[in-house]
Amino acid sequence: MLLTLLKGKLHRARVTHADLHYEGSCGIDGDLLDLAGIRENESIDIYNVSNGKRFRTYAIRAEAGSGIISLNGAAAYMADLGDIVIICAYAQMDEQEADTHKPKLVYCNEDNTVKDTANIIPVQVS
């Protein structure tokens, strides 16, 4: 049996660009892509914390160090500039791989620089 687990996440990134007429995709600062282990053309889910919208597109590389998070094509309708988003990539693996899997988590500052990285999500407490 294959399980689908979180592979990489950009947490609380901010949308910096939207281009309705660009080919569909999400342009992501190359440094952030690499840190989160997200590959170019990989399917990603985007969760808009600011408005609750959730959608899927694919990642493309934006200039490293630019802080760019650009929603392109139809995805440009899903967020406003400055919206806070969570960008996730998932991977399928068997149960044995899942037992040792650690996701790559990247926590972003307001300017999309790296605030912190981790490979475990803290236990939620009441």
From Swiss-Prot:
Its PTM note reads:
Is synthesized initially as an inactive proenzyme, which is activated by self-cleavage at a specific serine bond to produce a beta-subunit with a hydroxyl group at its C-terminus and an alpha-subunit with a pyruvoyl group at its N-terminus.
Query: Chief localization class?
Result: cytoplasm
Q: Which domain of life is it from?
A: Bacteria
Active-site feature positions:
S25 (schiff-base intermediate with substrate), Y58 (proton donor)
GO MF, one term, reads: aspartate 1-decarboxylase activity
Residues that bind substrate: T57, G73, A74, A75
Q: Could you tell me what the cofactor note in this record states?
A: Binds 1 pyruvoyl group covalently per subunit.
Task: Work out whether the entry's keyword set contains Isomerase.
Answer: no
> According to its UniProt record, in which pathway does this protein act?
Cofactor biosynthesis; (R)-pantothenate biosynthesis; beta-alanine from L-aspartate: step 1/1
State the needed cofactors, names only: pyruvate
Its catalytic activity? L-aspartate + H(+) = beta-alanine + CO2
Q: Which InterPro entries match?
A: Asp_de-COase-like_dom_sf, Asp_decarbox
Q: Which UniProt keywords apply?
A: Autocatalytic cleavage, Cytoplasm, Decarboxylase, Lyase, Pantothenate biosynthesis, Pyruvate, Schiff base, Zymogen
Cellular component GO terms held in the UniProt record: cytosol
Q: Sorted alphabetically, which CDD domains does this protein's record hold?
A: Asp_decarbox
Q: What subcellular compartments does it reside in?
A: Cytoplasm
The Gene Ontology biological process terms listed for this entry are:
alanine biosynthetic process; pantothenate biosynthetic process
Q: Which residues carry this modification: Pyruvic acid (Ser)?
A: S25
Q: How does it assemble?
A: Heterooctamer of four alpha and four beta subunits.
- What is this protein for, i.e. what is its function? Catalyzes the pyruvoyl-dependent decarboxylation of aspartate to produce beta-alanine.
What the entry lists under NCBIfam families is as follows: panD
Q: Which family does it belong to?
A: Belongs to the PanD family.
Q: What is this protein called?
A: Aspartate 1-decarboxylase
Gene name on record? panD
